[in-house]
Every structure is written in structure tokens, then in C-alpha cells.
Amino acid sequence: MNNKKAGVLLVNLGTPTAPTAAAVKTFLSEFLHDKRVVDMNRFIWCPLLHGVILPIRAPKVAKLYQSVWMEDDSPLMVYSQRQVSALQDRLSLPVALGMTYGQPAIKSGIELLEEQGCDEIIILPLYPQYSRTTTAAVFDQIGKQYKTTSVLPNFTMVHNYHDHPLYIKALAESIRLSWKEKGKGDYVLCSYHGIPQRFVDNGDIYAEHCIRTTELLAEELGLNSEQIGMSYQSRFGREAWLQPYTSETLKELAPKGIKSLDIISPAFSVDCLETLEELSEECKEIYMTAGGEKYTFIPCLNDDELHIEMMAAIVSSKISRS
């Protein structure tokens, strides 16, 4: 095996370049134009998106980004770059970053690796649970960006890692660390990003993966169904999404006697707007208003050592041995 010829591309969803309405509008436009995300008829969706949704949502979302923006960049970008650096040190291989939407583009990341002499590229979408809305969208971007290229790079793409032992171990250790530092709550709620129920009805395996991740995490922590559960957050639009919804679940827990809650989002590999603002702040308010007394938000795995170890193990298993 010639490690010098192998390179790694970490892929995440993307982020606005700045916490401004203009930057958020540009990012959301690209994201919500993807048929993997919204498959509504284009003649209906595009006028609705540009005439109603973006003008209203962009300024509101920009204010939310301002509340979590870090000194150097957005949280998603900062933590993603830390992952790149840590994984590169761990593997002693070139590692680059690509975003499905926005910059740096997936193609830019691949070209950067090729410039470093990589002729075998392992693409690791940082979505533990597969979905057409995330992992499949990465496939689409690669196909679109290399549509007119005569000779394609040698790609190997990771499909999912929802049940990888090191992933489950890393999640469990992050929860145990929270218990050690902040005390153990009555219940652990695993809040996953939601997708339309219709996508699952049409064959998306995302929900199956989320359920399995939760089951394995419960086993690792030694928790029963009265001590751990799952829900889905970030619903968009009026269509039915995967249930139970996190917002509704939070309203029900305290009246059932669960007065202290630990909440984690296993589907996110790095902290971002959906975890730092929605899960940490909005959801806390819902739970406390419903009668909760203690709400502990557990951060994403980010560049945690066990998380990087997991990535390294996955990549190493994909590199050619010939």
C-alpha cells in the first residue's frame, strides 16, 4: 500500500460565508434548490422559494447565525477544519474539506488532493445515518461536477457508519463525560435531524439507521427504554416529517416526571446552528416551560479524540491494499 497516493475528503453540508441576510440567502438558495432536499414541482417551488421563503427566512436565520458565530467563522466550518487537521495528523495522509453546498466545494477539495499527488481518494460524508437528503446529495454533486470529465479520479465513498463500534463508543463517552461534569439526568433524548415521512415511505433508510444507533447507544450505556429515547428536530414546512417531533416530545417529558434531561444529536458530526441554537437554546426553553428543572445539552463529537479515531479506522479500511 502506498499511503502517499491516498487522500481523504471529509464532506459536510455547508454553511453561509457570513452571518448576514445576503450570505444566508445565497446559501439557502443553493441548498433548497436541490431536489434531494425539496422535490416539489420546480414551477411551483422556485417562485415560492424566491418570492416568499428566502426574503422572509434569510434575515431571521441570519440573526440566529449571529448568536452562534465564532471569531474565525461559523461553528460548522471551524469544527470541520479542526477535524481535517486532526485526521491528517492521525493518518499522515492529505485530508481536505468539501461542502455539498457553498464553499469549499467538493470538487475543490478533490482537486486539492490531486494537486498533492493523490490518485486514490476516500470520500467520507460526515453523516452517520444515510439519507437521500444528505449522503445521496454528495453522490449527485460528484456526478454533476465531473459530468464532462474524461477520466474520473479513483473514488471510494463511505455510505454510512451509523452502527460503527467506535462511533457508538464516542457518543457514549461524550454522554458519560457530561454525566461526570454536570450530573446524570433522568433521561437521555437523542434528537436526530428530521426528514419528510414521505421520503421514508418511498424507501429512504434514514429512520432505520437512527433507530439502530439509538438501540446500540442504549446498550453501550446500559439504559432501558424508560431512560433513553429518540425524536426528530428541524421540521421545515407543513408536510408530515418523521415523528415524534423533538419539540412535542420535550413538552411531554416533564409532566411524565422526567425533571432533568440530557439531550444529544447523534446525526450531527459537528456543532452548528441546529445544535447550538435550536437544540441548546430553543429546545431548552420548550422543556423548561413545560415543567423541566434541568436541561443539559451535550455537544457534538466535533474533533473529539475518539471521533477522529473512528474516522481514521473507517478510512484505513477503505484504502487499497494493492
Curated annotation (Swiss-Prot):
Task: Report the subcellular localization.
Answer: Cytoplasm
Q: Where does Fe cation bind?
A: H193, E274
InterPro entries, alphabetized: Ferrochelatase, Ferrochelatase_AS, Ferrochelatase_C, Ferrochelatase_N
Q: Which GO terms describe its molecular function?
A: ferrochelatase activity; metal ion binding
Q: Name one GO cellular component term.
A: cytoplasm
Which pathway does the database say it acts in?
Answer: Porphyrin-containing compound metabolism; protoheme biosynthesis; protoheme from protoporphyrin-IX: step 1/1
Enzyme class, one word?
Answer: lyase
Query: Its catalytic activity?
Result: heme b + 2 H(+) = protoporphyrin IX + Fe(2+)
Task: Name a Pfam family for this protein.
Answer: Ferrochelatase
Gene Ontology biological process terms from the UniProt entry: heme biosynthetic process
Q: Which residues form a coiled coil?
A: none
Main localisation: cytoplasm
Keywords of this entry: Cytoplasm, Heme biosynthesis, Iron, Lyase, Metal-binding, Porphyrin biosynthesis
Q: What is its EC number?
A: 4.98.1.1
Family statement drawn from the similarity comment of this UniProt entry? Belongs to the ferrochelatase family.
Q: What does this protein do?
A: Catalyzes the ferrous insertion into protoporphyrin IX.
Entry protein name: Ferrochelatase
Which species does the entry assign this protein to? Aliivibrio salmonicida (strain LFI1238) (Vibrio salmonicida (strain LFI1238))
